[in-house]
Swiss-Prot record:
Homohexamer. The active site is at 337 (proton acceptor), 361 (proton acceptor). It comes from the Bacteria. The keyword Cytoplasm applies. Mn(2+) binds at residues 337, 361, 528. Belongs to the L-fucose isomerase family. It catalyses: L-fucose = L-fuculose. Pfam families: Fucose_iso_C, Fucose_iso_N1, Fucose_iso_N2. One of its GO terms (molecular function) is manganese ion binding. Its main location: cytoplasm. Pathway: Carbohydrate degradation; L-fucose degradation; L-lactaldehyde and glycerone phosphate from L-fucose: step 1/3. This is L-fucose isomerase. The keyword Manganese applies.
Length: 591
């Protein structure tokens, strides 16, 4: 099967078309802007898979309709999914703009005095607004000299933020969400909304019953050699934790081995269903070898599977991590309980950062008073205003233990292409695998147990669907916090000490849902959330605007908010602008 090519970024150098001196004097400067933009993006950005982002520059500067059409023909043949138009001068607005309504687009107008790049920028954006094709504006804060070929820091920030979000849009388009199973325990996010995926994300939904997973396991529709490798890897790296089950529910060594084997097989088969596996074709299983072109998936599990078969915790935790028995690799996106909306938040975070995502229940708000009452100790530092306990039954990416280290030696979660094998091993060493609690999971399983290191910046997100409004996005930037061991042990034991825990302190603003930690918890729109490494809420906001998903809750600084220029025409309050603009333009892939 031919591998699908990655989307590219097209660079469109536009120019004043008047000959006899004007165009000729601008050719080199204009094309150099395009080359500098392409060089910046190719140097600084990677796709979520780790490949360098490739830029395609128009063959000539664009002065009018003919050259614009020639550029479009080139871009169409090279899978350009995002465009950036650059110019240092006046050009002919509507004659030179990118008119593709589905492609994210930005215009960088050079801030110089010799030629009016800013005037073209304003004229072109006016044309975009009038035609209903939103575009992002890039204009440097400070005037540059005409021969200054550098890219100012503020321009670079906008170029890269736009490019990251635009590539996420282009990368999701045409892919599928694999819904493995149906609705889990009445969780609304697992009532998979096909229209949402099709109209807002440009994706399809592949619905597959869990009996297909059972068939693949029972009929050995997998690579049997790889299974042996996976078992040997687990034998080497898995540390087993406390079994809290009553004696009558504890499994012996043979039974536990069978549960481990099936859990690893689930990981292999779900992966194969998502992306395919040529090894299956070698066994004569050509149809199964193709997979479903899924960029994200969800597994229902509870309860129709888990009441008799091992749960999905081990499979999901390993798939969501940046490593397994094959070494370090790109993490998959697999949502627990088939919560497709949390899966979309995971997908957004992965596409923007290239990192693994931590799926969690937004479980408990612990106030300072409650913590002191229960433990006899006060919360201090970033935790002083209270904390949110993020914990689920063990499907969180193991990267979430934060045993990886950044350049300064701080705990973090790296993009998979930066992870060393010893860092992957450290994440495994920090994880215990605890037998699943029988009352929850009658078919057994193993839950990963780890504690996220403190002081790590995170962004928590969630997509919700509101009837009559459509999808909305929630964003809460904050930090993981480290509690004294005795305090952690007491609080953790009140929920389930065999599950992975992150203690999260959102950054407070003193206003609205971020007036205090309680309000963050109270305003969260569902029982699940996603942790993405870093304070990357601004990137989520830009991506959401491209998809026409309004942001209903965030604590991102106003100076970092970057949306299409037309949003400014939808009122003076920036959050109201977002709602009105998203309603006005409708979903990106209108249905």
């Amino acid at each position: 099967m031919k591998k699908i090519s990655l989307p590219k970024i097209g660079i469109r150098p536009v120019i004043d078309g008047r000959r006899m001196g004007v165009r000729e004097s601008l050719e080199a400067q204009t094309m150099n802007m395009a080359k500098a933009t392409a060089a910046l993006i190719s140097e600084k950005l990677r796709h979520a898979c780790g490949a360098r982002v490739e830029c395609v520059i128009a063959d000539t500067c664009i002065a009018g309709m003919a050259e614009s059409a020639a550029c479009e023909e080139k871009f169409s043949s090279q899978n350009v999914g995002v465009t950036i138009t650059v110019t240092p001068c006046w050009c002919y607005g509507s004659e030179t703009i990118d008119m593709d309504p589905l492609r994210p687009k930005a215009i960088w107008g050079f801030n110089g005095t010799e030629r009016p790049g800013a005037v073209y920028l304003a004229a072109a954006l006016a044309a975009h607004s009038q035609k209903g094709i939103p575009a992002f504006s890039i204009y440097g804060h400070d005037v540059q000299d005409a021969d200054d070929t550098s890219i100012p820091a503020d321009v670079e920030e906008k170029l890269l933020r736009f490019a990251r979000a635009g590539l996420a849009v282009a990368s999701m388009k045409g892919k599928s969400y694999l819904s493995l199973g149906g609705v889990s325990m009445g969780i609304a996010g697992s009532i998979v909304d096909h229209n949402f995926f099709e109209s807002w994300l440009g994706m399809k939904v592949q619905a597959v019953d869990m009996t297909e997973l059972r068939r693949r396991i029972d009929q050995k529709i997998y690579d049997e050699t790889e299974l042996e490798m996976a078992l040997a890897w687990a034998d080497k790296h898995f540390r087993y934790g406390e079994d809290q089950n009553a004696e009558q529910y504890k499994r012996n060594e043979t039974q536990s081995r069978a549960v481990l084997k099936e859990s690893l097989l689930m990981a292999m088969c779900i992966r194969d269903m998502m992306q395919g596996n040529p090894k299956l074709a070698e066994k004569g299983l050509v149809e199964e070898s193709l997979g479903y072109n899924a960029i994200a998936a969800g597994f229902q599990g509870q309860r129709h599977w888990t009441d008799q078969y091992p749960n999905g915790d081990t499979a999901e935790a390993l798939l969501n991590s940046s490593f397994d028995w094959n070494g370090v690799r790109e993490p998959f996106v697999v949502a627990t309980e088939n919560d497709s909306l949390n899966g979309v938040a995971m997908l957004m975070g992965h596409q923007l950062t290239g990192t693994a995502q931590v799926f969690a229940d937004v479980r408990t708000y612990w106030s300072p008073d409650a913590v002191e009452r229960v433990t006899g100790q006060p919360l201090t530092g970033r935790a002083e205003h209270g904390i949110i306990h993020l914990i689920n039954s063990g499907s969180a990416a193991l990267d979430g233990s934060c045993q990886q280290r950044d350049a300064q030696g701080n705990p973090t979660m790296k993009p998979h292409w930066e992870i060393e094998q010893n860092e992957a091993d450290a994440c495994l060493a920090a994880t215990e695998w605890c037998p699943a609690i029988h009352e929850y999971f009658r078919g057994g399983g193993f839950s990963s147990r780890f504690l996220t290191e403190g002081g790590v910046p995170f962004t928590m997100t969630r997509v919700n669907i509101i009837k009559g409004l459509g999808p909305v996005l929630q964003i809460a930037e904050g930090w993981s916090v480290a509690l004294p061991k005795a305090m952690h042990d007491q609080l953790d034991a009140r929920t389930n000490s065999t599950w992975p825990t992150t203690w999260f302190a959102p950054r407070l603003t003193g206003k609205g849902p971020f007036s205090d930690v309680y309000s963050v918890m109270a305003n969260w729109g569902a029982n699940h959330g996603v942790l993405t490494i870093g304070h990357v809420g601004a990137d989520f906001i830009t991506l959401a605007a491209m998809l026409r998903i309004p942001v209903c809750m965030h604590n991102v600084e106003a100076a970092k908010i970057y949306r299409p220029s037309a949003w400014a025409a939808h009122g003076m309050d920036i959050e109201g602008q977002d709602y009105r603009a998203c309603q006005n333009y409708g979903p990106l892939y209108k249905r």
